[in-house]
Amino acid sequence: RHNFILALNSKTHASTTVSSTIYIASSLGIKFFATGGIGGVHFEAENTFDISADLNELSKTNMFVICSGAKSILDLDKTYEHLETLGISRIGYQTDYMPGFWYYQTDKQVDHNFIKIKDLTNYLKIRENLKQDGSVLIFNPVPKNKSIDKTLIEKWIRRSVEKAKKNMIVGK
């Protein structure tokens, strides 16, 4: 969000994050946004304070965000807790659990699972009529037959993080 005005001012090209996209979409009256995964709390955030601006923006911008969870490279346990702390609704569409982006599900339960699109739509209409601030995350997992095994992904991420530390690779 903070770099959006800088890009406009300098008339340069830029890409958008979830936070800047929902900020722009909301200002244009768009109510729905679909993305692969949201940002979240990074591993070792207790030392680095590296938490995606997506979470803060989700807490204050009214948007219905459909996604397959938070990106797998993140600390999904801390991300789940931070979503709850910020009061962001974690809704499942035909799933009882928050998906893990590339894999079908984590062990984190959603606030509610809607099986029928009609029931989900009714919930969203009620929420909109009450003018409750903040976004609703609607988790729609990758199909089971297209998902990657959770243990494989976690192993790859762990190896990559260790390699980055060993090579002193850091970044924004």
What are these regions (language model features)?
Residues 101-129:
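Anionic-ligand binding region
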Residues 14, 32-37, 43, 65-67, ...:
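General beta-strand structural signal in soluble alpha/beta enzymes
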Residues 1-31:
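Ligand-binding beta-strand-loop-alpha-helix segment within the catalytic cores
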Residues 17-18, 46-59, 63-84, 117-122:
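Active-site glycine-rich loop that binds ribose-phosphate moieties when present
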Residues 78-85, 102, 106-109, 152-159:
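Short, solvent-exposed amphipathic alpha-helical segments in soluble enzyme
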Residues 39, 69, 94-99, 140-146:
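Glycine-rich beta-alpha junction loops
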